[in-house]
């Protein structure tokens, strides 16, 4: 629903609504519809310059000489929009990153943090991680367990292996995304076939066909870079990374996982380099993921004051004992760290939220917020709202006030809601910033935003009167 609202708002040029959807509802700025179009494309097509600039500043992609970039330029309704697209520097580090998981994987690829293998392709080195290559590709899993087993440096001299194409292939394995110059597409297709990456091969062929049709139908366009991106909500990358979490689980917690694609510890090893001991359970993990995803674990594992125990035997990974957490709760942390997702039942959400806050995992906190949102009822909404405020979960807080607006006539009779309004008013008075009360303002906003027909006006007025009567009764005028 929020995604459809975003596309409609971009066509209308409603900057305020788009800002609300991106910043409060956490909608992805580069989402695509069934016509393979992005919010930025519709803003350009409909001539909304202010909205175009806002989207660019908030992470909308518009790389020069790519299919999406050329499409936005060609479809732009006005010259000022075309100039904004051409003048705007590539949105990477300068913008507010929205996909922290994608950002982490990109850094892992570019910086090679805690890498354990180096590929040298015609003299050009590529640092990589055995665990990721094995999880993402059966071909790499087999080669790392046979021909390349035990090697920290793998030299590839075959004349048909292009270093540029190999780098693009690694980008795909790490991020699910691929950027390649059109002159290297055939080299990339050859490598994809050799590595048995059939999905990538199909995507490359489909993209080449789409770009050819676009260039032929739009004179003056020039596509020099081919970009492959996973479709919205594509589970392949995260599902592959979740296999590493499966391997990290101690045997007593694997339950009904069944046979793993590369059983641990026999057969192909996920090559763990750190062991977390939680109560009586041992999780065999990878520093690259935990240090890259969490400043807490980076300080614990990389800094000089780490509290590691000696390995039990030569060749075993070092052991770090974690306190004040149960194996069940750590399992949710584990799957989030590897795959950016965990199946989180609402009854565990608060416990996981507390741990996510301690381990400095903001994305896991947001997942907990989504789970807590399932608990919204008249009896619980104030308590959930307090949790959202405490842990700074803006989206959950907004969902709470939206729900409060729907049931405000009943809430005004509840003591916990009245107390929440008093506390908000007291906090504002202490700061002396404004006469309004944030909680009350948010409820008023949601009451007003639901009014779309004349029949809804009377209901909204009745809801607002109930709120105003409460404020008067407790001596607040705002």
Swiss-Prot record:
ANK repeats lie at residues 1-31, 35-64. This is Ankyrin repeat and BTB/POZ domain-containing protein 1. The keyword Protein biosynthesis applies. PANTHER family: ANKYRIN REPEAT AND BTB/POZ DOMAIN-CONTAINING PROTEIN 1, ANKYRIN REPEAT AND BTB_POZ DOMAIN-CONTAINING PROTEIN 1. Its main location: cytoplasm. GO terms for molecular function: translation elongation factor activity. The lineage of its organism: Eukaryota, Metazoa, Chordata, Craniata, Vertebrata. Keywords: ANK repeat, Coiled coil, Cytoplasm, Elongation factor, Protein biosynthesis, Repeat. SMART domains: ANK, BTB. May act as a mediator of the PTEN growth-suppressive signaling pathway. May play a role in developmental processes. Residues 115-182, 272-346 form the BTB domain. It is found in: Cytoplasm. InterPro entries: ABTB1, Ankyrin_rpt, Ankyrin_rpt-contain_sf, BTB/POZ_dom, SKP1/BTB/POZ_sf. PROSITE patterns: ANK_REP_REGION (PS50297), ANK_REPEAT (PS50088), BTB (PS50097). Residues 450-478 form a coiled coil.
